[in-house]
Design a protein with these regions (language model features):
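Bacterial Sec-dependent N-terminal signal peptides
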Residues: 1-24
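Pepsin/retropepsin-fold aspartyl endopeptidases
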Residues: 18-403
Length: 403
């Protein structure tokens, strides 16, 4: 899942809604230790995979099962062995083909008869990430995996010793071996333990389930509420939904404390820790022993964990860039959900497609910017400041407990 707080979120989360067992297939080699270089595309790890002598880009995603694009399916024609309902990150469900992929190579590792799914013909996040498939957790279930974001290397092995370092116990709750751990959210003396999925296919640090946030206001500060569009998933752009902007004073992962964590809520069943965790330290997943190790990099600041937040966000609707969500309530008298975005800082974006919009970066990230909008109701054109959202300026109580 890719987080763009200014623009949009891409959620690369794939799970079956029926009792399908995707822990099928194997690694050919008896003993293997591979040091694999990866590139970061929009903050996510992407690795080279070889199929029939041709190299393809695959997302390395612990929050998903093995999957390929419809284009790659048509090129390779693996056998279809069934169909299943697949849930995206917003909880929407669509029917997909289940395949048995005969052989693919991830450097010196050969995956044989891997079970996975074929995504739809029009898969916008595959197009924008320029990837052809997903290396999922079901392929890693008998291995130890180490992701080192500083060196941009992934180790996959069945003979790595993790030593006697502290670890988090991993839990598998589905038949695709997606790794869950428990973290702690704390505010003063009050704290709760929260089960989260470690999802390397999500760029931001932490997504908290919407209902969990509402139920735990003792440890979570709700600083803004809005209804809008934040996400693009495997089934396309998500529908308009209610979202919360949250402040969590402390989040503890593997005995390491992250302070002043600013996040938004997710509308699916899982809370998730994403790939931004990799910026802070080396993550090792021992799937066989069910252990997650996290080793903090030197000279890393964990005092403030926040994305670049702005007063409103932009999405795509009816093939046009539009206002997708408004966090600053004082702007609701000036702009509307669905107002067409004509330009950003004088750059005409009316003809931009989704991938161009996702590639746009504000420089520098914390400055104010100017957006030209066409009012969805009146057609009036006006220029509006898109400002950095300084949390202390907007913090307010949106929810009160009934006595």
């Amino acid at each position: 899942m890719i987080r763009f707080f200014v623009i949009l979120i891409i959620t690369v989360s794939v799970k079956t809604v029926f009792a399908q067992n995707f822990n099928r297939g194997r690694i050919k080699q008896r003993n293997y230790f591979e040091l694999i270089s990866y590139q970061q595309i929009k903050g996510l790890p992407v690795v080279p995979v070889t199929i029939h002598g041709k190299t393809y880009n695959f997302l390395f995603d612990t929050g998903a099962m093995f999957a390929i694009s419809d284009k790659l399916y048509r090129e390779t024609n693996p056998p279809i062995i069934g169909y299943t309902g697949i849930s995206g990150s917003s909880g929407d469900i669509r029917n997909m083909r289940i395949i048995r992929f005969p052989e693919l190579f991830l450097q010196g590792i050969t995956f044989i008869n891997t079970r996975g799914v074929v995504l739809h013909e029009k898969s916008e996040f595959f197009d924008c990430l320029e990837i052809d498939g997903i290396i999922g957790s079901n392929m890693l279930r008998n291995s130890t995996v180490q992701i080192d974001n500083q060196s941009k290397h992934i180790i996959i092995t069945n003979k790595l010793s993790s030593g006697k370092h502290e670890y988090q116990k991993m839990i598998f709750i589905d038949r695709q071996s997606r790794p869950y751990i428990y973290i702690t959210m704390q505010k003063g003396e009050k704290k709760i333990n929260q089960r989260v999925l470690f999802d390397s296919g999500m760029t931001n640090f932490f997504d908290l389930n919407f209902g969990t946030a509402i139920r735990n206001v003792d440890v979570v500060d709700i600083i803004a509420e809005s209804e809008g569009i934040l996400s693009l998933g495997i089934h396309g752009i998500h529908p308009k939904q209610k979202h919360l902007l949250l402040h969590i004073p402390e989040v503890v992962i593997s005995n390491l404390t992250f302070k002043d964590v600013i996040i938004t809520t997710a509308n699916n069943s899982n809370s998730r820790i994403g790939a931004k965790l990799l910026e802070y330290g080396k993550v090792t997943l021992d799937f066989k022993k069910k252990r997650l190790y996290f080793n903090l990099f030197d000279n890393i600041n964990t005092e403030t964990v926040s994305e670049n937040l702005y007063t409103f966000g932009i999405t795509i609707q009816n093939d046009k860039p539009v206002v997708g969500i408004i966090w600053d309530k004082t702007l609701e008298s000036e702009i509307n959900f669905g107002d067409e975005v004509l330009s950003i800082n004088g750059i005409d974006i009316q003809s931009w497609n989704l991938c161009q919009l996702l590639s746009f970066e504000f420089q520098p990230a914390n400055d104010d910017h100017y957006v030209e909008l066409r009012n969805i109701n009146t057609g009036e054109i006006k220029k509006v400041a898109l400002k950095c959202l300084h949390i202390k300026d907007y913090e307010q109580e949106y929810w009160k407990r009934s006595k």
